[in-house]
Design a protein with these regions (language model features):
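Substrate-recognition/cap regions that form aromatic- and gly/pro-loop-enriched pockets
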Residues: 1-98
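Activity-critical C-terminal alpha-helical subdomain
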Residues: 81-130
C-alpha cells in the first residue's frame, strides 16, 4: 500500500506508524518507504497541484496485512491522502472525490468518451463510480 499526502503532513503520518505497528498482532516485515515529488497538473495524479510525500507500507505475499493497511489508510485519508492507483487500497469513488479536485471533471470526460463503459471493470466501478 502506498499513499501520497501533502508534504507538510509527512511528520504527522510518520508519527502515527509506531503506534499502529505496536498494536498489530503480527510483525511488520518491510521498512517503510518515503519519497518526494513536486506538483503536477494531471487530474487524477497523486501529486496533482501540490508538493507531495509518498509513504509505502508492505508485507510479504501470504502474510497478514489488512489491519496494518487499514490503520495506515485511516491516518492518511484525513490528511487529504491519495492512494496509489496500482496498489491495494480500500477507498471508493465517494471518498476519492474528496481527495481529487478534478475528479468530477475526469468523470465527465470518461462519460463523453466511454458512455457504454466498454473500458471498465469492477475496480474502476468502485474507484470511479459506475
Amino acid at each position: 500500500m502506498e499513499y501520497e499526502i501533502p508534504r507538510e503532513c509527512l511528520g504527522e503520518a510518520l508519527a502515527a506508524l509506531p503506534r499502529i505497528i505496536a498494536q498489530l498482532p503480527f510483525k511488520v516485515q518491510f521498512p517503510v518507504e518515503v519519497r518526494f515529488t513536486g506538483p503536477d497538473d494531471v487530474w487524477l495524479s497523486h501529486g496533482y497541484g501540490r508538493d507531495s510525500a509518498y509513504i509505502a507500507v508492505h508485507q510479504f505475499s501470504g502474510s497478514p496485512y489488512e489491519p496494518y493497511f487499514r490503520a495506515f489508510e485511516a491516518v492518511c485519508a484525513p490528511l487529504s491522502g491519495r492512494p496509489h492507483w496500482g496498489k491495494l487500497h480500500y477507498r471508493d469513488a465517494e471518498s476519492l472525490r474528496q481527495a481529487y479536485p478534478k475528479f468530477d471533471d475526469f468523470r465527465a470526460v470518461r462519460d463523453q468518451l466511454d458512455p457504454g463503459r466498454i473500458f471498465t471493470n469492477a475496480y474502476l466501478d468502485r474507484v470511479l463510480g459506475a
